[in-house]
Curated annotation (Swiss-Prot):
Residues 34-443 are lumenal. The chain crosses the membrane at residues 13-33. The gene is CHST9. GO terms for biological process: carbohydrate biosynthetic process; glycosaminoglycan metabolic process; hormone biosynthetic process; proteoglycan biosynthetic process; sulfur compound metabolic process. It comes from Homo sapiens (Human). InterPro entries: Carb_sulfotrans_8-10, Sulfotransferase. This is Carbohydrate sulfotransferase 9. The lineage of its organism: Eukaryota, Metazoa, Chordata, Craniata, Vertebrata. Residues 108-128 have a biased composition (Polar residues).
Length: 443
């Protein structure tokens, strides 16, 4: 054969490459199918072995939604995998200093200390036992008691057996009028429904003093610092209310709050302890909060609230004010308060009492007022059997050289506001005005 005959023309080269390519592709597809069949066969064989040996995949507990009614809680427990142990009390708690959102609800449960978590988990993976059934029924009993709890909490007649002095007769009459007024208001406008899921937020501002069986709801700018001093003395944490510093009162964490207890503890205390709340004219309380937090140096309120308020409500603000947040004007503060799109959330110092203490849910046994604070507080102390030498302190906790915020001071702050702005402030706090029978002389 001549060398010239061995040379393939381009057409033959193309056909040869095409044939080899098709053949290679078919071979690859065949091998892939064969490998998959082999792998599937092994998997099926393993499954058969595991089924015959009684093995099954673990189904973990589904996460509990944040906001649940009591009925949903019970349904959730019932529908869990029966091979798993649901602890009697599992507790989920969230602390937040600011009331930035309208507060998500906390579902409280508490891990049992009688057995370790790993031990409980290992025991629960078998078939249900009588012990497990009993524990599950016990958990349901707690939730059933919670669901049957009357909302609002029942109001109880005050025990006046320890009040011997006739000088308190007028105070007693005033107290009965306040209680009756609040009770009638709540009957007419309360509208309570499905509040079980909000229980732990509802009681988050309530302090507990077990020795004298007191529940006190903290309302900032209504004598709360001195009330917490009194609770510390009653708890045996101090010998005198006059020797406790501001920082020890607010940052010492010496006092217990009601939301730190389990469901049974909360339920029992709400229905057996004397529940007290002290309130103040909403406009006076608002001005007092502004003076305290924005007219004096403050390492928290100026950078957190002041900067945001100045940035949004002050046109052409200077750089220094935007950096340090100092010098907020009352009118700017009011614009922030009334803004439905606030640049920073609410704070307990100017939050409504209706949202701090929930008077129509808790049904307080004692309603004190800042306007008659010393008289109301000392009558209350005598009524609960406090030591005779313990009197409510009347000193100003902070900025003692400043004049106390009263009606005359409030008028000076309101004079720069329009009538519409003053009306809007009233509208914002109208529930507090109505619940506690405050008039509106500043409009």
């Amino acid at each position: 054969m001549q060398p010239s005959e061995m040379v393939m023309n381009p057409k033959q080269v193309f056909l040869s490459v095409l044939i080899f390519g098709v053949a290679g592709l078919l071979l690859f597809m065949y091998l892939q199918v064969w490998i998959e069949e082999q792998h599937t066969g092994r998997v099926e064989k393993r499954r058969e072995q595991k089924v015959t040996s009684g093995w099954g995949p673990v189904k973990y507990l589904r996460p509990v939604p944040r906001i649940m009614s009591t009925e949903k809680i019970q349904e959730h427990i019932t529908n869990q995998n029966p091979k798993f142990h649901m602890p009697e009390d599992v507790r989920e708690k969230k602390e937040n200093l600011l009331l930035n959102s309208e507060r998500s609800t906390r579902l409280l449960t508490k891990t049992s200390h009688s057995q370790g978590g790993d031990q409980a988990l290992s025991k629960s993976t078998g078939s249900p036992t009588e012990k497990l059934i009993e524990k599950r029924q016990g958990a349901k009993t707690v939730f059933n008691k919670f669901s049957n709890m009357n909302w609002p909490v029942d109001i109880h007649p005050l025990n006046k057996s320890l009040v011997k002095d006739n000088k308190w007769k007028k105070t007693e009459e005033t107290q009965e009028k306040r209680r009756s007024f609040l009770q009638e208001f709540c009957k007419k406008y309360g509208g309570v429904s499905h509040h079980q899921s909000h229980l732990f937020h509802t009681v988050s501002r309530i302090y507990v003093e077990d020795k004298h069986k007191i529940l006190y709801c903290e309302v900032p700018k209504a004598g709360c610092s001195n009330w917490k001093r009194i609770l510390m003395v009653l708890n045996g944490l101090a010998s005198s209310a006059y020797n406790i510093s501001h920082n020890a009162v607010h940052y010492g964490k010496h006092l217990k709050k009601l939301d730190s207890f389990d469901l049974k503890g909360i339920y029992t205390r709400l229905n057996t302890y004397t529940k007290a709340v002290f309130v103040r004219d909403p406009m006076e309380r608002l001005v007092s909060a502004f003076r305290d937090k924005f007219e004096h140096p403050n390492s928290y309120y100026h950078p957190v609230f002041g900067k945001a308020i100045i940035k949004k409500y002050r046109p052409n603000a200077c750089e220094e004010a935007l950096i340090n947040g100092s010098g907020v004007k009352f009118k700017e503060f009011i614009h922030y308060l009334l803004d439905s799109h606030r640049p920073v959330g609410m704070d307990i110092h100017w939050e409504k009492v209706s949202k701090l203490c929930y008077p129509c849910l808790i049904n307080y046994d004692f309603v004190g007022k800042f306007e008659t604070l010393e008289e109301d507080a000392n009558y209350f102390l005598q009524m609960i059997g406090a030591p005779k030498e313990l009197k409510f302190p009347n000193f100003k906790d902070r900025h003692s050289s400043d004049e106390r915020t009263n009606a005359q001071v409030v008028r000076q702050y309101l004079k720069d506001l329009t009538r519409t702005e003053r009306q809007l402030i009233y509208d914002f706090y109208y529930l507090d005005y109505l619940m506690f029978n405050y008039t509106t002389p500043f409009l």
